[in-house]
Amino acid sequence: MKRLTSILMLVAICYLCPMSTESQNQPAAPTLAPSPSLAKGSRCFELRTYYAAPGKLEELHARFRNHTMKLFKKHGLEVVGFWGPTEKEKGSENTLVYVLAFPSREAREKAWRDFRADPDWQAAAKESEKNGKLVDKIDSVVMMATDYSPIK
């Protein structure tokens, strides 16, 4: 229960952080100067929010369930959890939120690069989008735990 509370706090806090839209072909964002309050040796976390195309959220869930999860494991993208909003806000009915963990920022960049280059991912993405794209927008926040965070 304590771990779940920590994860939910992480997700809630991250919603207060400014988010940037990710582009599949964009270089990694520049890093901020390290804060003294960041935990030394913390893993790198990534909060991702997907805004599904209208009417495509269940197809997006199916792609994660049937293809993406296996490929995440293959390429070292450790899933902390997936969430769906329970309060009605503009666009929330098409939203999927998840958190990934990596040993380091460099490991994150390599894992995503390898994942996107994987022919199995490319085939799954192409097949799942044969009737139109599934995702309108992706927001991504790359984070490190603070020194007082129960999850590192």
Regions found by a protein language model. Give the residues of each.
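Positively charged n-region of N-terminal signal peptides that target proteins for export
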Residues: 1-4
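Short, surface-exposed ligand-recognition loops at beta-strand->loop->(often short) alpha-helix junctions
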Residues: 52-61
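Active-site-flanking beta-strand signature of metal-NTP-handling nucleotidyl enzymes
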Residues: 45-49, 97
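Short, low-complexity, Pro/Ser/Thr/Gly-rich segments in the mature regions of secreted, periplasmic
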Residues: 144-151
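An amphipathic, aromatic/His-enriched active-site/gating alpha helix that lines ligand/cofactor pockets
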Residues: 24-41, 62-80, 88, 92, ...
